[in-house]
A protein has these predicted regions:
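Short beta-strand micro-motifs within the conserved protein kinase catalytic domain, predominantly
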Residues: 89-102
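Catalytic-loop of the protein kinase fold
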Residues: 142-159
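ATP-binding glycine-rich loop module of kinase domains
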Residues: 24, 29-73
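Activation segment signature within eukaryotic-like protein kinase domains
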Residues: 130-131
Length: 369
């Protein structure tokens, strides 16, 4: 698709560019308004003149129908909650197939993304505003029992407003309803350096022994813990030399640390978010309550190492055969919209108490540390 061409009433303003290997992106105009447009590189809908036997083409059509239903169901759920454009969630306002390709349309947003290194240099109260705004956006999604699946700073663009900061949430290509990820694991790409242990195990399980029920909103919480490390310290968690990703380190009981000394409540929160067992992680409402109740006058002595720095040997590793023994500990958010300032001021404080469970797994041996 090239500049000047028209598709379903959208005039393409720029040649499409490959983005992330799974899609091409551009901008388009319709009825005098500019939109963001994405073309999916897969799946491709087989037409009557497409190569291959009719049996193979029918299989591909079925896969495309499932892909289309998945995206429409997500878009409808988010759209009903957000009621139009201009909100915190930048979701697809149009989704269609043209020929063999699928396209997604979202509103165009003009937001400059802050590098995490710059965010970490802000006063703590400003970093907290950014973190709470990010949580507000994510809790809308979790209130619908939808897992984002690809949280990262690029998908949480920040806008500086007159009264603070607004963090949007974009790119729901890897999103799914809690416990029901797409069966085609190859299309659940995400961003490996932000994987949770259970997300990595599910995607990398070639024998497909790990059930989708293991993937809940708590997977996003692990990823958000990595992002919070970037917000508050300027970098992802510091890992031992043998590990490349946070999830491999946590999965093998490795110790993590941070680039700089963190406020004790923030340090403790991030460590809980990075728990191996999803049941030991706070839900998104509990994360918000901790951030809301941070006491800025508390100072961590630089010469004192936090007791929580000592790693605990994990009681499980995610691997083939892993099944949650219950749904306890997976506490869905109770709100589906971001709270107003009045609601925030009235919200009852919630003391976070992690739930310890007897989860066990047989261990997925992953070469890439």
């Amino acid at each position: 698709m090239l500049k000047g061409e028209n598709i379903k009433g959208y005039k393409i303003l720029e040649d499409f560019k490959v983005a992330g290997g799974m899609s091409k992106i551009s901008f388009a105009e319709k009825d005098g308004k500019t939109y963001f447009i994405k073309e999916f590189l897969a799946p491709k809908y087989p037409t009557s003149d497409s190569p291959g036997s009719e049996r193979i083409k029918e299989q591909k059509r079925k896969a495309c129908d499932e892909f289309e239903k998945h995206h429409r169901d997500l878009n409808n759920a988010i759209g009903k909650c957000c009621a139009g454009t201009g909100g915190n969630l930048i979701y697809a306002i149009d989704f269609f197939r043209d020929g063999t390709s699928y396209y997604k349309i979202t509103e165009k947003i003009d937001i400059s993304s802050f590098p995490c290194e710059s965010i970490s240099c802000l006063p703590l109260e400003k970093i907290l505003l950014i973190a709470k705004s990010a949580v507000h956006s994510i809790r809308i999604l979790h209130g619908l029992k939808i897992v984002h699946g690809d949280l990262k700073p690029d998908n949480l663009p920040i806008k500086e407003a007159a009264r603070g900061y607004v963090v949007k949430l974009i790119d729901f290509d890897d999103s799914y309803f809690e416990g029901n990820p797409p069966p085609d694991r190859e299309n659940l790409v995400g961003t490996p350096e932000y994987y949770s242990p259970e997300q990595a195990a599910y995607i990398m399980d070639e024998d497909e022994e790990i059930e989708g029920a293991t993937l809940t909103c708590k997977s996003d919480i692990f990823t958000l813990g990595i992002i919070f490390s970037e917000y508050f310290s300027g970098e992802k968690p510091i890992l031992p030399p043998d590990y490349k990703n946070t999830w491999t380190c946590v999965n093998n009981g490795g110790a993590i640390s941070f680039k700089k000394k963190l406020h004790p409540q923030i340090d403790g929160l991030i460590r809980k978010m990075l728990s191996l067992n999803p049941n030991d992680r706070p839900n998104i409402n509990e994360v918000f309550n901790v951030l809301k109740n941070i006491k800025l006058d508390e100072i961590t002595p630089s010469s004192e190492r936090m007791s929580s720095d000592e790693p605990k040997k994990p009681s499980l590793r995610f691997g083939p055969g892993f099944k949650p023994i219950s749904s306890k500990g997976v506490s869905p958010a109770t709100k589906t919209i971001a709270p107003t300032p009045e609601e925030i001021s009235k919200e009852k404080d919630t003391e976070y108490k992690p739930v310890h469970s007897g989860l066990r797994g047989s261990g997925l041996k992953i070469a890439d540390k």
